[in-house]
């Protein structure tokens, strides 16, 4: 995965429409939340576009842009203004180099679809997040990319269960739908290549006779640090403990 993103660093911004859409959706959901933040992780920061918005929202905070791809981080550095307090760090989302309970906000825009298992990511976020710290994320739901990929994405309730099992509390989730239409299949393939995701669509896509469009189910969520982590790999939760955001 690191090699794919390194290769895509120079083209990512030209095809980041979905990332930009969900980034704006996350920032809109962040707006009414009141939290005093000193240290914020932009987890899976890619070329750093979210960091600039987070700096405007949290003017006194230090933004820590974390990504597995050194080339993505280098691209992000070129966007940094001289007044920026953003630091750039190459690290794995499942092994963050931060002390326990030292982070106020973790912002993760479309990181989870790239992870084979969300549980280690949630566990690590739970570890570094302070009590009453905020985890805010966007990911893809199971109705995304139907007909184009074989690996299913987790549904909203599975995501909520996994958050609670990792020791994150009071999750609130909502779902949005997004359709992206292309001029032709070749344009769709070009965009997937540009963001390092060519492996997500079949090699024979141009012979499949599919419409050149993407239907995406977007899951937005936020939750808080300081919950009880489950033991023994099992967690049971009443459906009412997973909040659904009013639309």
Description of each model-found segment:
Residues 1-24:
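Class I SAM-dependent methyltransferase Rossmann-like catalytic core
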Residues 119-131:
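A short glycine-rich, Lys/Arg-flanked "PGG" loop and its adjoining helix->strand segment in the class I
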Residues 130-187, 195-204:
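Conserved catalytic/acceptor-binding region of the Class I
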Residues 174-247:
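Conserved Class I S-adenosyl-L-methionine
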Residues 18-37, 53:
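Conserved alpha-helix/loop element of class I SAM-dependent methyltransferases that forms part
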Residues 39-95:
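Class I SAM-dependent methyltransferase SAM/SAH-binding core
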Residues 104-117:
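A short SAM/SAH-binding and catalytic strip from SAM-dependent methyltransferases
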Residues 94-105:
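A short acidic, Gly/Pro-enriched loop at the edge of an enzyme's catalytic core
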